[in-house]
Amino acid sequence: MAPGLPTAMDRPHFIGIGGAGMSGIAKILAQRGAKVAGSDAKESETAEALRALGATVHIGHAAEHLADDATCVVVSSAIRADNPELARAAELGIPVVHRSDALARLMDGLRPIAVAGTHGKTTTTSMLAVSLSTLGLAPSYAIGGDLDAPGSNALHGEGDIFVAEADESDRSFHKYAPDVAIVLNVELDHHANYASMDEIYASFETFVDRITEGGTLVIAADHEGARELTRRVTASGVRVVTYGESADADVCVLSVTAQGLKSEVEVLLDGTELTFTVSVPGRHYAHNAVAALAAGVALGIPAADLASALAAYTGVKRRLQLKGEEAGVQVIDSYAHHPTEMTADLEAMRAAAGDARILVVFQPHLFSRTQELGKEMGQALALADASVVLDIYPAREDPIPGITSELIIEAARAAGADVTPVHDKAEVPSVIAGMARPGDLVLTMGAGDVTELGPRILDRLSKQ
């Protein structure tokens, strides 16, 4: 049976409880019997899902939202130091716990699988959660996105396995001690926290050093950054299992065959060929499934059982999620916000769509990312037949002088892309309705609130 409540976490208060990572931890604590409370900037389906579990969720941040008897205050790196609930916690002497420390405590006593990498963490974690659940292993899991319904990003299971995303953005993945660690890829991102690839490699090396004695590192064989990390950690003595299409991979991907919005994957593992279906399109998602397969095998689960169970995975919200179809136009939501992710999703859709036109509504995420990768984002958009580019979604950042979406638009046009800038999101449904024709695919793409436009575009198309 999974352990109970960590010490001093029986009455936690979460600042920003509606966030993907925070809400998952809050949900697991509530399911373990904690009296959970918290606050968030706005009302959401996630807040409602937490209330259904007995949590108290306040909208807005105010000192009075923090109960005097709270045993700890949980924060993420996105919470600013001047938050009034943080100030109140200091007055009351209530300890402040980072989200990553809270998650690490939840994994104590279990067999953790930590999924790391610049791209693909949510999908791979979800694949593991679904396949292990399908096999009756009742894992606990904490995912950075909902599987199929609000609040489905986390679960307290009665089994002894805990699957979690391991976030490198703020180095919080250094807090975990996994039995199995997955590294999907290693690239420069999160430019506010990392100045160079050497800093990125050093951070991932620290993560690998945290693998428990006798544990396993599952790492991509095809990705340049992952191969370099493998070279750097080989001397540490950790058991390494590589996967990919490279001939020297321990788990060798023999083929990935597109079948509409699905893929058939054939792998060679320990001399045995296995074939299974992944219910989302794209070679990158097929590789994520192979990483999940290798991680499960590292924990002693039969490969054939895992291969069959992976077919139960039907996707996660915002990862090439079909939102609907109107007037012969399908609208699909993509979380891609880094050029590598954008390219992978657009190539996947091109393989699935055949001759259909692909229209993209892209919202850049973060000024710092646009400053460093804006040119590459524009080049990725050249893979679409036409694109609408919105203003930058700031998230936690303040504006950077001179950094706007125009950097992306100029690069896209230089690469031959058809790009339309739109500054008012409210205009997007009409703009897309004027561009789209039956048979087209429309992708809303980005990590910000561009996802809200999918239903609005469908509504506008229904009135054509």
From Swiss-Prot:
Source domain of life: Bacteria
EC number(s) stated in the UniProt entry for this protein: 6.3.2.8
Pathway linked to the protein: Cell wall biogenesis; peptidoglycan biosynthesis
Major subcellular location class: cytoplasm
Gene3D superfamilies reported in the protein's UniProt record: Mur ligase, C-terminal domain, Mur-like, catalytic domain, NAD(P)-binding Rossmann-like Domain
Keyword Transmembrane helix: no
Gene Ontology cellular component list: cytoplasm
Keywords from the named record: ATP-binding, Cell cycle, Cell division, Cell shape, Cell wall biogenesis/degradation, Cytoplasm, Ligase, Nucleotide-binding, Peptidoglycan synthesis
Function: Cell wall formation.
Protein name as it appears in the record: UDP-N-acetylmuramate--L-alanine ligase
The organism of origin for this protein: Streptomyces avermitilis (strain ATCC 31267 / DSM 46492 / JCM 5070 / NBRC 14893 / NCIMB 12804 / NRRL 8165 / MA-4680)
